[in-house]
Amino acid sequence: MVDMYASLRSNVGTLGQILGDTIRTDLDDTFLDKIEQIRHLAKSSRQGDSAARKEMLTLLSSLSDDELVPFAKAFNQFLNLANIAEQFHTISRNCDELVCVPDPVEQLLGRMLGGNIDQEKVLACLKTLDIDLVLTAHPTEISRRTLIQKYSAVIDSLTAQENTQLTEQEKKQHHLRLRQLIAQIWHTNEIRNERPTPVDEARWGLCTIEASLWQAVPDFLRQLNQQVEERTNTQLPTDIAPVRFSSWMGGDRDGNPFVTSAVTQEVLDRNRHTAARLYLKDVVLLVNELSMEGANEALLAYTNNSNEPYRDVLRTLRQKLRNTIDYLNGRLEGQHPDVDPSEIIWHESDLKDPLMMLYQSLCDRGMSLIANGLLLDMLRRIACFGIHMLRLDVRQDADRHADVIAELTRYLGMGDYAHWDETEKQSFLLRELSSKRPLIPANWQASPEVEEVVKTCRLVATQPARAMGSYVISMASQPSDVLAVLLLLKETGCPHPMRVVPLFETLDDLNNASACMSALFSIDWYRGYTKGIQEVMIGYSDSAKDAGVMAAAWAQYTAQEKLVAISQEANIKLTLFHGRGGTIGRGGGPAHEAILSQPPGSVDGRIRVTEQGEMIRFKFGLPKLAVQSLALYTSAVMEATLLPPPEPKPEWRQCMQQLAEESVLAYRAIVREEPDFVSYFRAATPEIELGKLPLGSRPAKRRVDGGIESLRAIPWIFAWSQNRLMLPAWLGAGEALKAASERGDLPLLQEMEKHWPFFKTRISMLEMVYAKAEPNLSKFYETSLVPKELHHLGVQLRERLAIGIEAVLELTQAESLMAHTPWNRESVELRNPYIDPLNFLQAELLARTRREEQSSKNVELALMLTIAGVAAGMRNTG
């Protein structure tokens, strides 16, 4: 039998061997031998060899302080290199067909156009697709930007070595380059010395666009155009942009005091600066390309019958882009440069219109072949990225807006808004929204917290509409939460209607979302403001932390169904914004399956989805990977729109409702009602130590005091993934499935898993999490770190994990987890022998740091490296 993953294992082996040689050169044979010995013992330990495990633990505990950092670094870097090999494998020529699916758009177009869907309907859907991927910094990408660039260079080197035409000398050169890169990686500090600022995070997002998406977007659209043309003999429009990009980096101030109005302004300027700089590169290339003379009458008239009409137009654009960069450099340096708007790129049309004139002229003069090269690529970049690169969302907590209005009403002697009921609040807000006089007095001295919210609204008011995305209200629950933001935007002079988006996060808020929106839709003023268009955000992270994944998933599903129904009834065009994380506990998982498992009618050609931290790198970090991801999103949204899944049967709904009710009880019985749970959580995981790691710009807690409810969803999940129990991603679900099976519902569950995409996705996600969970490792953390009087809770949790695994295997009728997804299983198994030693060492280091009043620098750094390494191995942080 052919080994499906031979080339993957070969690359992992090659990279691992080079890393080993690098370590030997830097340290010595003895140290490398010790690493290899521990790795082999970890493999044997995983196969049940208790003597090997004992020997490995003895070796780990005997590591000197000086050995801790290089040891943790070695295993950490091996896991990063394994990730690189896996990323490369999915875009490699040697990639196995089971891993690299054929182009999803090509498959879908074939299925639709070969079936009974009208060609015009398919093309109309494709041309109007509105997929907005929102880049966010949390859960923070653990790897430093400098290392990410080196990892990309490793993939470039592996790609170059695939060329079968290379001479021996060229092969040696590429291998030498690989060795140099891995040596650079080994000698680079992996852990940031300082926590990144929100501006650093925004720059990281811009780097992803420059390094990958800038090339991937036109590449993808060229492939898409070719597929459509071959099947329909139709060209796609020059300005087609099925996928666009927005960002929360520098705009998300929910619980992050470091995101101020000044920071948001700087990020907006940086976004625009990056766009101008990249467009300038394109124009410089076009000046060289478009040397031809023949032009249509419009272009000749515009250039006064120039001998080089195309170059004349491009030279003017080149100068305007240079002026734009100079202007933005001045702003970023804190100056307020005077500028003639006609001398810079001020509006998108300043850039697009001259280029469209060149495009039309080339086509008119029989030079379409030339027009459809770099010039079309640039036009499509403009359609996707605009002149602001990323549309920036603003996100703020609902309470912060209420605080502004309460402080204002008290100052004006109108009473205390904070003490009014919902009816009184709505009445006041609507009266003020309709009033022609200003509400905020010119001489009002607000408190610093309130002033910052007002400053943000003032900033939004000064920005071009296309620079901004949505104003997202976190923890929204009432119509007044939305109306309050609209009033603040009105009072600060916002000249254009901005999308104001409630984010429903908790179980109760999801269940009440349709009632809240229905109340808003019944307000004439509000309907006039929205002009029949509404966006609503569904929160995955906090609802799962509140109720467990099974109950949260059902609440998200039913909330969407109801929102779609009331929007259709009110003749409102609804866009659902999915706040998914990279992990299962935060709504993560394969995007294609996730979109196809949404309720019928909820996608309808448009969707917004957050793309989180480390998942941005895994999906979009390389141009070829990004093209695959763009194709997956496009095909999934088209399929969900034109071939939506069937409505779930009433008996499926009833069963799912019961599963949700039972799972939330099982989840909360532990997380909320077990008195020792918080103490166990803090002892058994590195939750406290995670707060010290210089990861994202945002504090780990919403409040300094408080328990699990005050902890952000990201560190909550990150901590449990470190000790390998993965608890937030499964607790409650297995117990509910077992109860359903015991009451005779197993055939019904199997029918649901086979025919209902929503339920199938849930079970698939559970399988993946169960496969990654390691009860023996979590028990080791418990033995090393948790007071004995709390061990009973660990026993209970591991029993629940076993119940869940058994329930899922019974449902799927499989002998092992992920039997139907061998690639995912291979991915997990490949990493385990390298993650396990890091886990054992982490538990040892946690015990040391908690025993000692002052740990050595080496112990602290090694602990951080184990945290980074486990995150790299688990392929997710929070």
Curated annotation (Swiss-Prot):
Its EC number is 4.1.1.31. Keywords: Carbon dioxide fixation, Lyase, Magnesium. It is an enzyme of class 4 (lyase). GO terms for molecular function: magnesium ion binding; phosphoenolpyruvate carboxylase activity. It catalyses: oxaloacetate + phosphate = phosphoenolpyruvate + hydrogencarbonate. Forms oxaloacetate, a four-carbon dicarboxylic acid source for the tricarboxylic acid cycle. NCBIfam families: PRK00009.1. This is Phosphoenolpyruvate carboxylase. The gene is ppc.
